[in-house]
A protein has these predicted regions:
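Sec-dependent bacterial lipoprotein signal peptides
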Residues: 1-22
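Secreted/periplasmic proteins
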Residues: 23-171
Length: 171
């Protein structure tokens, strides 16, 4: 047994340095959640960063609010964050978490950047769930559903971004 507190501290720090790097970057990407999961007997595998950066999808979008009156009994997202209905966030079944997507309401042309931090929707025929605030900004909160197009802008901590196409930097 080591009696010197400085040596004990050095051993603990050394063990932490050896242990934590192995779990800090799943899949080799900072800030990227790639765990598979199951809901109602259906298994889902999140796509790779490379797949996500090329991902675009058109489908039916809905909005959800898992918080209750004044935020009491508010749930957590798949990333462990509190559900915040006033934030511009959303849920997708297989995109990496977190990631930022550009959502376009094809019914009125409104566009919004949304951070995905949750899984869902788990209702057939829907490709994206948004918070009430995001749905309001896109103009479909009253209707409940809208046809939208999503395009991934960045994945994880923001280091992995869609490459711009075009010969000028602003195109």
């Amino acid at each position: 047994m080591v009696k010197n507190p400085l040596i004990r501290l050095a051993l603990v720090c050394g063990a932490a340095v050896l242990f934590f790097p192995s779990c800090a970057r799943p899949g080799g990407y900072d800030g990227y959640m790639m765990r598979s999961y199951s809901v109602r007997g259906q298994s889902y595998q999140p796509m790779s960063v490379e797949q996500a950066l090329k991902f675009e999808e058109t489908g039916v979008c809905s909005w959800y609010n898992e918080s209750s009156f004044l935020g009491i009994k508010r749930g957590n997202t798949s990333l462990g964050e509190k559900v915040m209905p006033w934030h511009l966030t959303g849920a997708h079944k297989t995109l990496p978490l977190p990631c930022v997507v550009k959502v376009t309401n094809l019914e009125n042309g409104k566009t919004l950047k949304v951070r995905l931090n949750d899984r869902g929707p788990f209702i057939a025929g829907r490709h994206l769930d948004l918070t009430p605030r995001a749905a309001k900004k896109l103009g479909f909160r009253e209707n409940g559903l809208a046809t939208t197009h999503i395009k991934v802008l960045s994945v994880g901590d923001g280091s992995y971004k869609r490459k711009r196409r075009g010969w000028l930097f602003f195109f």
